[in-house]
């Protein structure tokens, strides 16, 4: 195992190797809120590009750290290994190779090597622990666009806020990282997938010390001010800590977005997402154009990126990102826009799951109809 100081330096350097469009504030230049967040990430996890890519807007880095730490990393009602594995599966479905590789390595770090290998190989999970297998099969079904006959949730009512918070934060990170990370820093040597699988297992062995269990509940909350929980995120209420984290996170994203995204764009995106039931989108990206009528200039570019990133993140390419980034290359502005776009898409995705879970019976179910007018009002508020 590598010496601790060198290990964390290496992790940080590797994590920004494929970063594009934005850059992370160097550790030696960090001050104020940026330094507070950097220090807490280092103490409770490890610095990596999925978090530091938002450092040009410290409040947004703090927001995603609060949401991720309190939902994903803290072992409260659900164990950390299950959440790492769930996030690995979700990252795979959301087409975020950077996130997928890091999370598969974290599953290795937990000692669940068979689960990590099954997830990486997109296998049927037969060799995975039965309890974990049920959880991963549910996530695979619930997160796959257009999925039908989704099995009942394997989580209790007390566990659901933590799981939904995990899915919200990870989906946001997936979408954001899909844009700002150009693939994974871990490559398959000579194109041999087995070689990459071995690298991820070795990387996992170096990540073992980062699994500092148990983490103090609620430690990150004070990084941002208190906020009211939006009505459509009421699924978090049964766990006050998760509700507090989600409220602060949502408020920060909306607050930072307000200075760079027009009300018209927010309304157009809200209406588009309110009619989306999680279905698979057509291969051609022309499906989005009908939702953009009446928009021009930067409003058009921002709305297009947000809607595609929400419904089909795998269809987002450099042309969409470059159109929003513009000639001025204002990284802070881009982070504000992208953080909002990633959040609203993830919010819709998780709210669909929350409503399904609330209505499910002991039988398999398909996605129920949603009151689209009500949800549009919630998203636009």
Where are these regions (language model features)?
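Hydrophobic alpha-helical segments
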Residues: 1-381
């Amino acid at each position: 195992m590598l010496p601790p100081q060198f290990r964390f330096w290496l992790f940080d350097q590797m994590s920004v190797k494929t970063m594009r469009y934005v850059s992370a504030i160097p550790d030696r230049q960090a001050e104020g809120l940026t330094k507070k967040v950097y220090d807490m990430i280092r103490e409770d996890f490890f610095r990596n590009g999925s978090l530091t890519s938002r450092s040009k807007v410290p409040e947004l880095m703090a927001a995603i750290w609060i949401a991720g730490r309190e939902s994903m990393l803290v072992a409260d009602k659900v164990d950390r290994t299950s959440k790492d594995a769930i996030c690995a599966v979700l990252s795979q479905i959301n087409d975020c190779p950077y996130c997928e590789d890091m999370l598969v390595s974290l599953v290795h770090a937990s000692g669940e090597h068979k689960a990590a290998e099954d997830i990486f190989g997109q296998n049927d999970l037969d060799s995975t622990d039965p309890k974990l297998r049920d959880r991963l099969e549910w996530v695979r079904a619930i997160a796959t666009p257009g999925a039908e006959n989704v099995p009942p949730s394997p989580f209790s009512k007390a566990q659901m806020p933590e799981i939904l918070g995990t899915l919200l934060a990870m989906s946001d990170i997936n979408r954001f990282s899909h844009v700002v990370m150009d693939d994974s820093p871990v490559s398959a040597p000579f194109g041999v997938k087995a070689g990459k699988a071995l690298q991820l297992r070795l990387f996992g062995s170096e990540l073992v010390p980062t699994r500092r269990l148990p983490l103090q509940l609620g430690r990150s909350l004070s990084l941002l001010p208190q906020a009211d929980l939006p009505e459509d995120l009421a699924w978090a209420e049964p766990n006050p800590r998760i509700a507090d984290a989600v409220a602060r996170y949502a408020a920060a994203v909306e607050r930072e977005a307000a200075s760079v995204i027009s009300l018209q764009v927010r309304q157009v995106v809200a209406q588009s997402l309110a009619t989306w039931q999680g279905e698979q989108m057509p291969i051609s990206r022309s499906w989005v154009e009908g939702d953009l009528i009446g928009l021009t200039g930067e409003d058009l570019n921002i709305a297009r990126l947000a809607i595609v990133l929400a419904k089909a993140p795998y269809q987002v390419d450099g042309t969409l990102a470059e159109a929003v980034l513009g000639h001025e290359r204002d990284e802070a502005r881009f982070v504000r826009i992208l953080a909002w776009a990633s959040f609203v898409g993830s919010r819709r995705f998780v709210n669909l799951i929350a409503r399904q879970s609330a209505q499910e019976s002991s039988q398999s179910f398909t996605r129920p109809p949603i009151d689209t007018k009500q949800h549009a009002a919630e998203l636009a508020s």
